[in-house]
């Protein structure tokens, strides 16, 4: 019931840990760009130590322990039967079969199209430092000030996405957070390029990141799986991963062609020109053509729930 909210809370708290980066920029690095490696070395060491601490002292969840105990109490014959059924289900899967199935059914087909648009905007998540330094011509001190507000915006919008998902459903979350990402990225570009204030610039790009990945986690990690039958669920979710890589690669190729042509001062507008159409396309497709999946029983999902009645009837007749 509150899985998305709890996940968002944990993620938001973790994001606030990145406040260490601007703090180290202002102290150890002292806003001298040649010392950047010192900034990232310390968080890496701290992260390693904390991970080791968690590995040694974190306890298993009650859900896992209950499931494990239930499995150990199951007779060996029944375990073997379950394993056999699992292998038979996996044998029905495969990426090629999943792709064919996805394009054949309305929900998954439009999810793929929406993801193609959505991931075209992914360059915005990796190029904000370039925009601030090269296009907005912000000083190292201004970038440090912006980075103090970046985790705050990121954590806040990550938290919002979790509460929206549990309260209003997957589709509303994706549309709302995509709109939020679009607004925040526009604000980031204009705040940086027109020298409004580094604090607003940092908060805006943080809001974009939190909104973008809040929508991305929902569309890729949840809706694909909730729109697929059990025997194809794992294979269908791989499609999302492939789309992320393909569209991200395509966006990178486009920028590699454009970067030598346009001046550095225009980089921000170039990334804006790729981010806005991608997010707008994803919003329109999700709103008009994709159905809600919240509350579905994953054991009974067939993938045909969103097809037109005539098509479903034809498939049932073919199956008979």
Regions found by a protein language model. Name each.
Residues 1, 215-228:
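Intracellular juxtamembrane helix-capping segments at the cytosolic ends
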Residues 4-30, 46-47, 240-252:
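Glycine-rich segments within core transmembrane alpha-helices of 12-TM secondary carriers
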Residues 21, 105-155, 248-252:
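Extracytoplasmic gate region of multi-pass secondary transporters
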Residues 37-56, 269-287:
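Symmetry-related core transmembrane helices of the 12-TM Major Facilitator Superfamily/SLC fold
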Residues 70-109, 309:
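Juxtamembrane intracellular "pre-TM" segments in multi-pass secondary transporters
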Residues 167-178:
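Cytoplasmic membrane-interface "Motif A"-like loop-to-helix N-cap segments
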Residues 179-195:
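C-terminal ends and interior cores of transmembrane alpha-helices
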Residues 198-215:
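Hydrophobic core of transmembrane alpha-helices in multi-pass small-molecule transporters
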């Amino acid at each position: 019931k509150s899985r998305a909210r709890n996940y968002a809370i944990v993620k938001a708290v973790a994001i606030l840990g990145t406040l260490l980066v601007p703090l180290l920029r202002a102290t150890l690095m002292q806003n001298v760009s040649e010392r950047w490696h010192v900034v990232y070395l310390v968080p890496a060491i701290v992260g390693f130590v904390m991970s080791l601490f968690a590995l040694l002292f974190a306890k298993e969840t009650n859900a896992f322990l209950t499931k494990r105990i239930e499995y150990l109490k199951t007779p060996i014959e029944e375990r073997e039967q379950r394993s056999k059924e699992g292998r038979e289900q996996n044998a029905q899967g495969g990426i090629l079969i999943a792709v064919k199935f996805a394009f054949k059914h309305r929900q998954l087909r439009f999810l793929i199209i929406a993801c193609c648009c959505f991931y075209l905007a992914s360059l915005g998540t990796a190029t904000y430092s370039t925009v601030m330094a090269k296009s907005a011509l912000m000083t190292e001190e201004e970038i440090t000030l912006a980075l103090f507000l970046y985790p705050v915006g990121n954590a806040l919008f990550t938290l919002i996405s979790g509460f929206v998902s549990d309260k209003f459903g997957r589709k509303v979350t994706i549309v709302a957070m995509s709109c939020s990402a679009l607004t925040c990225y526009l604000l980031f570009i204009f705040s940086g390029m027109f020298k409004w204030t580094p604090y607003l610039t940092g908060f805006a790009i943080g809001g974009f990141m939190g909104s973008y990945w809040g929508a991305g986690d929902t569309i890729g990690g949840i809706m694909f799986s909730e729109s697929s039958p059990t025997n194809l669920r794992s294979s269908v979710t791989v499609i999302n991963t492939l789309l992320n890589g393909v569209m991200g690669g395509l966006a990178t190729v486009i920028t590699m062609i454009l970067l030598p042509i346009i001046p550095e001062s225009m980089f921000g507008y170039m990334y804006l020109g790729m981010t806005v159409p991608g997010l707008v396309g994803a919003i329109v497709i999700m709103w008009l053509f994709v159905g809600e999946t919240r509350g579905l029983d994953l054991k009974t999902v067939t993938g045909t729930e969103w097809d037109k009645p005539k098509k479903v009837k034809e498939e049932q007749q073919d199956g008979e």
